[in-house]
């Protein structure tokens, strides 16, 4: 995979109003999709899904021009996610935000300046490992049933003495 600069992945993010860059995101013009013998090779934004020890899986957003590819489930993980997240920006001054998707986390960072990670699913709030050094956690959730689930899971899992949690 190559850096995002001047790639369809960068154009995809920019089409969504996302101008920030993260070293966790890359682009590959020929990303395999499908089983052996029926594999297609498509352009994709590639995201490292990481723990403290480093990457353990990847997340692929398949693209068509500067949009998500038009087929069922154009966003797919490869590998077991466990407690990992797409760590777009490192926590700073004890602050970290969690959002469901990469685009939401990037947008939250752009709007608030709070470093954010993508959990890769509302159901994964509470599963993602948050560093003990985080004293101010922001849960950037959608305002729907999935977001309510994410908020309740996050509040239950991440509460501890010395940590403030904000649902946004």
Predicted regions, residues:
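A structural preference for short, hydrophobic beta-strand core positions in alpha/beta folds
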Residues: 118, 166-167
């Amino acid at each position: 995979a190559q850096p995002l600069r001047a790639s369809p992945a960068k154009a995809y993010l920019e089409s969504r109003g996302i101008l920030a860059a993260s070293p966790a995101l890359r682009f590959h013009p020929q990303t395999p999709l499908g089983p052996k013998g029926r594999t297609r090779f498509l352009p994709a934004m590639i995201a490292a899904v990481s723990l403290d020890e480093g990457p353990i899986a990847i997340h692929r957003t398949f693209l068509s021009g500067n949009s998500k590819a038009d087929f069922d489930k154009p966003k797919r993980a490869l590998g077991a996610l466990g407690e990992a997240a797409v760590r777009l920006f490192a926590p700073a001054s004890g602050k970290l935000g969690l959002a469901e998707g990469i685009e939401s986390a990037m947008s939250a960072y752009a709007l608030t300046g709070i470093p954010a990670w993508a959990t890769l699913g509302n159901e994964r709030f509470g599963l993602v490992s948050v560093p003990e050094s985080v004293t101010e956690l922001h849960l950037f959730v959608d305002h729907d049933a999935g977001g309510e689930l994410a908020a309740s899971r996050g509040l239950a899992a991440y509460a501890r003495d010395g940590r403030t949690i904000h649902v946004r």
